[in-house]
Amino acid sequence: NTAVYFQSETLAVRVGGSGAGAVGDFKSFVERGVVINKSGTLSIVRSRTSPASSGTTTGWSPINSVSGTNFLQTVKGANNRDIEWVSTIRMTQLKTGVTL
């Protein structure tokens, strides 16, 4: 039985493409949450903010999730836009002998 606090800081910058907006459009994201491993079953509770953006960034987002026994981060951009993504994810883990 484990609880893991995570904080994900992500930056997306448009570097090309023919869709609306322009090269250099950007958006930043901070997502925080807790993943619980309860007897081998993972669950996640999280919230996300976007502290800064410029240009056309509608629909862009990182998504932190769990699948099976894995923590995942996927990203979603927009049609006809080339976007580069960088992310730092910090995790703090607490293992306990009690049932969560």
Question: Residue spans of the language-model regions?
Answer:
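Surface-exposed coil/turn segments at beta-strand junctions on protein surfaces, enriched
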Residues: 1, 66, 78-80
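Beta-rich globular "head" domains
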Residues: 1-35, 84-92
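Short, exposed beta-strand/loop patches in secreted or surface proteins that constitute
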Residues: 34-36, 58-66
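Glycine-rich, low-complexity segments
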Residues: 37-55, 90-100
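Secondary-structure transition/turn motif
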Residues: 48-52, 74-81
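Noncatalytic modules at the cell exterior or secretory-pathway interfaces
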Residues: 65-75
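Domain-scale recognition of soluble eukaryotic interaction modules
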Residues: 70, 84-86, 96-100
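Mixed-charge, glycine-accented linear interaction segment located at domain edges/termini
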Residues: 76-80, 88-95
